[in-house]
């Protein structure tokens, strides 16, 4: 009997995407799966047909051969084509799509792979100076390391683990529950796939031991709160020789007494005297590289921002350097003696009648207030 067209089997068009093909396969495989149709030979045949169509149409090379030559292009008994090897066992492809729903994973597959080591996270707090300039930090990391007595095998020196005879190295066993077959960790080997008859005395068969290791970690200049540094292979050791996990260093930067950071720019407030603001002059302002001089123009108002280019932070991701922005805040003099108070009174008296000239903002404000109340009463 001639085979049906694979696209027809799945109920999709020839221009169907891989996602549409997979969706159709899921629906039909669920419908015809033998675990849902026990003893139904027709359903079993339909499942094999659906599975075969899915295998061909989701393999780029086989699909191309099928689209060009039809079934002949994927017939292993013919000279050309993609060498398709038949429908095989139910579980091979079904497990890829449904996982453990029916316990149909790779029944004919290899032994369970040892698990990769867990990733670790280390929270590192830096001062602003450390974050901006970069440094090398010595970190002490509590972790699980490969046992140095058994070299991570978990078995006593001179012995080795044997394949579990219950699960045959799979690490899982199948249990039937009604119409369904589910997979559970093997109760004999506890999901490992191997049995250690003579465990290592140091690690007690685990292959790993608790250890605190010291790492020298280079922190690049310009890091900021939220940045993360990945150290490949510095996490926990894997099970029985499997690859180690990674270590992630999570950076946070403490608040600074003077500077506030925003991206690559730094901000600070610089107090200046009343006379300096009025007459102008030079003041010293702090930077992360030391003090620098800043020229204050005469008649500078409080809150004015001055930009010192290139005095900010060098970006950790580029060569760009931010700026330092200094906000001047005029400080009202306190603890005045009588002579100083008298001088200020004399100065205030000289401003009488000339407020618009000397304090235009204040005069404008009070004019606005006066007009506001006049409008209320009108």
Curated annotation (Swiss-Prot):
Residues 5-70 form the J domain. Keywords: Chaperone, Cytoplasm, DNA replication, Metal-binding, Repeat, Stress response, Zinc, Zinc-finger. InterPro entries: DnaJ, DnaJ_C, DnaJ_domain, DnaJ_domain_CS, HSP40/DnaJ_pept-bd, HSP_DnaJ_Cys-rich_dom, HSP_DnaJ_Cys-rich_dom_sf, J_dom_sf. GO terms for biological process: chaperone cofactor-dependent protein refolding; DNA replication; protein refolding; response to heat. Zn(2+) 2 binds at residues 164, 167, 186, 189. GO terms for molecular function: ATP binding; heat shock protein binding; unfolded protein binding; zinc ion binding. Binds 2 Zn(2+) ions per monomer. It is found in: Cytoplasm. Its cofactor is Zn(2+). CXXCXGXG motif repeats lie at residues 147-154, 164-171, 186-193, 200-207. Its main location: cytoplasm. CDD domains: DnaJ, DnaJ_C, DnaJ_zf. A zinc finger (CR-type) spans 134-212. Gene3D superfamilies: DnaJ domain (1.10.287.110), Heat shock protein DnaJ, cysteine-rich domain (2.10.230.10), Urease metallochaperone UreE, N-terminal domain (2.60.260.20). It holds the Pfam family DnaJ. One of its GO terms (cellular component) is cytoplasm. Signal peptide: none annotated. Zn(2+) 1 binds at residues 147, 150, 200, 203. SMART domains: DnaJ. Participates actively in the response to hyperosmotic and heat shock by preventing the aggregation of stress-denatured proteins and by disaggregating proteins, also in an autonomous, DnaK-independent fashion. Unfolded proteins bind initially to DnaJ; upon interaction with the DnaJ-bound protein, DnaK hydrolyzes its bound ATP, resulting in the formation of a stable complex. GrpE releases ADP from DnaK; ATP binding to DnaK triggers the release of the substrate protein, thus completing the reaction cycle. Belongs to the DnaJ family. The J domain is necessary and sufficient to stimulate DnaK ATPase activity. Zinc center 1 plays an important role in the autonomous, DnaK-independent chaperone activity of DnaJ. Zinc center 2 is essential for interaction with DnaK and for DnaJ activity. Homodimer. This is Chaperone protein DnaJ. It comes from Shewanella oneidensis (strain ATCC 700550 / JCM 31522 / CIP 106686 / LMG 19005 / NCIMB 14063 / MR-1). The gene is dnaJ.
């Amino acid at each position: 009997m001639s085979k049906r067209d694979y696209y027809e089997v799945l109920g999709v068009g020839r221009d169907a995407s891989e996602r549409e093909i997979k969706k159709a396969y899921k629906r039909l495989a669920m419908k015809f799966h033998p675990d849902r149709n026990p003893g139904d030979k027709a359903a079993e045949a339909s499942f094999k047909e659906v599975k075969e169509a899915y295998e061909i149409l989701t393999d780029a090379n086989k699909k191309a051969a099928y689209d060009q030559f039809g079934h002949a292009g994927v017939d292993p008994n013919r000279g050309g084509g993609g060498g398709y090897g038949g429908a095989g066992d139910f579980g091979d492809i079904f497990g890829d799509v449904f996982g453990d729903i029916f316990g149909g994973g790779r029944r004919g597959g290899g032994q369970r792979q040892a698990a990769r080591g867990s990733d670790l996270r280390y929270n590192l707090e830096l001062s602003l100076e450390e974050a901006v300039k970069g440094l090398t930090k010595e970190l002490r990391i509590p972790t699980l390391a490969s046992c140095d007595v058994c070299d991570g095998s978990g078995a006593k020196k001179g012995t080795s683990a044997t394949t579990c005879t219950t699960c045959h190295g799979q690490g899982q066993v199948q249990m039937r529950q009604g119409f369904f077959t589910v997979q559970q960790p093997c109760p004999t080997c506890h999901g490992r796939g191997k049995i250690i008859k003579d465990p290592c005395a140091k690690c007690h068969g685990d292959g790993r031991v608790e250890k605190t290791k010291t790492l020298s970690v280079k922190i690049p200049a310009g890091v900021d709160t939220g940045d993360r540094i990945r150290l490949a292979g510095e996490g926990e050791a894997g099970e029985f020789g499997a690859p180690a996990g990674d270590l992630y260093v999570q950076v946070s930067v403490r608040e600074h007494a003077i500077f506030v950071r925003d991206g690559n720019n730094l901000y600070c407030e610089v107090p200046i005297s009343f006379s300096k603001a009025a007459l102008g002059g030079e003041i010293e302002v702090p930077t992360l590289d030391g003090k620098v001089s800043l020229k204050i123009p005469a008649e500078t108002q409080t809150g004015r921002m001055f930009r010192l280019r290139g005095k900010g932070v060098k970006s950790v991701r580029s060569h760009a350097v931010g700026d330092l922005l200094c906000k001047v805040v005029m400080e009202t003099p306190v603890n005045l003696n009588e002579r100083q108070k008298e001088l200020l009174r004399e100065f205030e008296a000289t401003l009488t009648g000339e407020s618009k000239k000397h304090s235009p903002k204040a005069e404008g404000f009070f004019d606005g207030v006066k007009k506001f109340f006049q409008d209320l009463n009108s």
